[in-house]
Amino acid sequence: MVGMNDGGGGGVVRVPGLADETNPTGTGGRAVEVDYVRCFHRHEPGENQCSSAVSKHIKAPVHLVWSLVRRFDQPQKYKPFVSRCIVQGGVGVGSLREVNIKSGLPATTSFERLEHLDDNEHILSIRIVGGDHRLKNYSSIITAHPETIDGRPGTLVIESFVVDVPDGNTKDETCYFVEALIKCNLKSLADISERLAVQDYTESIHH
């Protein structure tokens, strides 16, 4: 995982030191991640906001990973904390969804709007517009980038966010909490994508 933490101040997410134990491409790969963040993950955190980004290298081709990520109407396909999702109307920029959270978390419902969806560049952006949780003015961007891992097609996924810091919490505490949720989501995304990739590879051999 890569944590790229910005305590506020505007502009793109700052990337201090990168440490990614799952990075198969070494230092050069980390430089690429920094470039992707600067190009695609532009946030303007206010004085009482924090912004950060998390990355994950997945041993599955980008089209497969993206087929899960792009489903604004079905985040439960890979997000383990989502029990169900209801979309009002069709799926497109401006669409709203009601996301129900599984019991055990300090929230039950989140209302979210689709801000941007680009199937060519593999970019998805959402904004939380309501719900019984503490993630106020939360906005996120997730991108998927093709790469090669162990000689096979792989995907680098980066998810960044900006959010208000709740009363009684520090910027570091808020970023740590959100990063932990994103890491769980990306681990689940990797597990599911890699399992599907193995199935596809096995089927191609038998055919």
Each model region followed by its residue ranges:
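Amphipathic alpha-helical interface elements that mediate macromolecular binding in regulatory proteins
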Residues: 63, 67, 73, 112, ...
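Beta-strand/loop substructures that line and gate deep hydrophobic ligand-binding cavities in soluble
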Residues: 3, 125-184
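Short, highly charged C-terminal tails/helix-capping segments
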Residues: 39, 187-207
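Short amphipathic alpha-helical segments embedded in low-complexity Lys/Glu-rich regions
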Residues: 82-86, 174-175, 205-206
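Hydrophobic ligand-binding cavity/cleft-lining segments
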Residues: 2-92
